[in-house]
């Protein structure tokens, strides 16, 4: 899709949303076509680094113990220790709240079997299974990358809606993020963007603005 048409859709989305007393998010909505999504190879499951960043921090939880847990605490991240992890396995309601409140999860590699048992049934369907790291990992580079990343997981649905930033970002920044996501879609399929039926940009409380093909 043409960069200028993506930019025009971002600008139109702003005009379709009334001012609110909070900073609205901006999403890209994409409808796919002519894909057999019962076949796993046709599904989109991607983590995409946004060239303009997210515009606001995303909550990250670290499942760890010892030095890695201490490092995560010093960084102001949510820390889930082994005893808490075991409790979450028994309390699905609390586990769901934690899953919904965090964009990404990181787990100490030797805790992954327990993570799979305790949180796997909650995180798996949400496409949020943790990134495993060794006990002596430096979390800073991974956290920095996640703060610029969005995740797409279509499963068997021919539609996805993904965050591309906030209304406080410039039109050019938002358009660059939307284009980066559409480029991933284009590279995924042999026929590229032919498989995009239509695409829109939208603010939280606004109507969707179509991206002209």
Curated annotation (Swiss-Prot):
Keywords: Repressor, Ribonucleoprotein, Ribosomal protein, RNA-binding, rRNA-binding, Translation regulation, tRNA-binding. It holds the Pfam family Ribosomal_L1. It comes from the Archaea. GO terms for biological process: regulation of translation; translation. Part of the 50S ribosomal subunit. NCBIfam families: PRK04203.1. This is Large ribosomal subunit protein uL1. It comes from Methanococcus maripaludis (strain DSM 14266 / JCM 13030 / NBRC 101832 / S2 / LL). The gene is rpl1.
């Amino acid at each position: 899709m043409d960069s200028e048409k993506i930019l025009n859709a971002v600008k139109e989305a702003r005009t379709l949303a009334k001012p609110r007393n909070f900073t609205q998010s901006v999403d890209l909505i994409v409808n796919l076509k002519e894909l057999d999504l019962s076949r796993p190879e046709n599904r989109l499951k991607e983590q995409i680094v946004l060239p303009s960043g997210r515009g606001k921090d995303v909550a990250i939880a670290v499942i760890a113990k010892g030095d890695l847990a201490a490092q995560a605490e010093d960084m102001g991240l949510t820390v889930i220790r082994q005893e808490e992890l075991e409790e979450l396995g028994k309390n699905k309601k609390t586990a769901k709240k934690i899953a919904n409140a965090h964009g990404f999860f990181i787990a100490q590699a030797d805790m992954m079997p327990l993570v799979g048992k305790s949180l796997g049934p909650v995180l798996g369907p949400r496409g949020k299974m943790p990134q495993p790291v060794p006990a002596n990992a430096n979390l800073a580079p991974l956290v920095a990358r996640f703060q610029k990343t969005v995740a797409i997981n279509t499963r068997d649905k021919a539609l996805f809606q993904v965050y591309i930033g906030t209304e406080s970002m410039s039109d050019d920044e938002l358009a660059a993020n939307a284009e980066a996501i559409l480029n991933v879609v284009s590279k995924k399929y042999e026929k590229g963007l032919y498989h995009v039926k239509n695409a829109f940009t939208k603010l939280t409380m606004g109507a969707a603005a179509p991206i002209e093909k």
